[in-house]
């Protein structure tokens, strides 16, 4: 993102803390909700697993398509409109989700949620704090990923309880209220007076376009992009299917909720370990470990049904390996 003027760029603990709360709610109520409503959706709407999964895939596609324009809007100082609008859109779509009665309606809702995710999750808020705190953005990002990493720990049990108590439709409406009543006001109030682009660092549009194109076509950029795509295809796909996958493994409902919920806490541990590596070892060693930890965790999960009495220990091994790897990946990425 573009460097901003030095004016009003001192670190603000309160702003970062409240933005972190909004991240916790946004991740928990949108990204981690699908795995819990997949089963009820399929039963009530008569959908196959492929048809229900397509809804989440469409959301991810919509999020990806909006990533670049959202970044440009934030870079031009429209962060308040982007993130407040994204929270309102998320609330509207979650509320509409409670009224979904067809496959087409489900897909429309999740495309809208994909647009909302592009405007309210980590990527846009990281851009915001980088512009606001150019000399202290790392501290802000660390804080937000610590609290945001607990989204599954908080919201998977909460959403499961809401579904059991209210039904999945009213549960979605309750989650919608959090975006309208909490996230949208937070973004609207906190993100006033967006910093302006520094004139000293302004770049002619034509030169900026050529520079961007050169970077995007360079071998390092393409290799990093390939790595991120491959890793994210796993880290995004598994949470969406984890609850149903664990149920198919024959685990009890307590384990089914506890396992994905506990991954959030382990992710925070992974981020702490990353900073330990940075201080005491070569950070690139951690970068090389990440692609190993998560596949090993998946192998442990797949092998769990055939491990007999060690089944519980193997599942815990999956939680530890996957959680640490995914927690580190967020920071490194």
Please place each PLM-identified region on the residue numbering.
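Helix-to-loop junctions at the C-terminal end of transmembrane segments
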Residues: 65-78, 270-283
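Helix-loop-helix hairpin linking two adjacent transmembrane segments in secondary transporters
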Residues: 103, 135-136, 143-195
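Extracytoplasmic gate region of multi-pass secondary transporters
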Residues: 30-39, 213-276
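C-terminal transmembrane helical hairpin of 12-TM major facilitator-type secondary transporters
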Residues: 228, 235, 255, 261-267, ...
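Hydrophobic core of transmembrane alpha-helices in multi-pass small-molecule transporters
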Residues: 24, 93, 104-120, 145, ...
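Intracellular juxtamembrane helix-capping segments at the cytosolic ends
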Residues: 41, 117-133, 328-333
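Extracytoplasmic
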Residues: 14-52, 66-70, 156, 231, ...
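Flexible cytoplasmic inter-helical loops of multi-pass small-molecule transporters
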Residues: 190-210
């Amino acid at each position: 993102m573009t460097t901003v003027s030095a004016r009003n760029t001192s670190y603000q603990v309160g702003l970062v803390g409240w933005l972190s709360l909004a991240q916790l709610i946004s991740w928990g109520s949108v990204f981690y909700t699908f795995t819990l409503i997949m089963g009820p959706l399929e039963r009530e709407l008569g959908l196959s697993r492929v048809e229900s999964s397509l809804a989440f895939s469409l959301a991810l596609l919509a999020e990806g398509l909006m990533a670049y324009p959202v970044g440009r809007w934030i870079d031009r100082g429209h962060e308040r409109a982007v993130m407040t609008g994204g929270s309102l859109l998320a609330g509207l779509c979650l509320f509409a989700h409670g009224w979904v009665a067809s496959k087409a309606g489900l897909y429309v809702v999740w495309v809208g949620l994909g647009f909302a995710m592009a405007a309210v999750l980590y990527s846009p808020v990281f851009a915001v704090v980088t512009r606001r705190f150019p000399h202290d953005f790392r501290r802000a990002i660390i804080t937000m990923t610590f609290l945001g990493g607990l989204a599954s720990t908080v919201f998977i049990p909460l959403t499961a309880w809401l579904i059991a108590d209210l039904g999945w439709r009213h549960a979605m409406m309750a989650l919608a209220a959090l975006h309208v009543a909490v996230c949208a006001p937070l973004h609207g109030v906190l993100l006033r007076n967006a910093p302006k682009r520094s004139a000293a660092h302004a770049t002619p549009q034509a030169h900026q376009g050529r520079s961007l194109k050169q970077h995007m076509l360079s071998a390092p950029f393409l290799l990093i992009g390939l790595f991120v795509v491959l890793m994210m295809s796993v880290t995004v796909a598994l949470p969406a299917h984890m609850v149903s996958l664990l149920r198919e493994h024959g685990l009890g409902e307590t384990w089914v909720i506890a396992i994905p919920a506990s991954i959030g806490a382990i992710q925070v541990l992974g981020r702490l370990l990353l900073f330990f590596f940075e201080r005491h070892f070569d950070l690139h060693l951690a970068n090389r470990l990440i692609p190993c930890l998560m596949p090993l965790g998946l192998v442990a999960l797949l092998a769990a049904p055939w491990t007999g009495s060690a089944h519980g220990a193997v599942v815990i091994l999956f939680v530890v390996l996957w959680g640490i790897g995914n927690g580190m990946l967020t920071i490194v990425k």
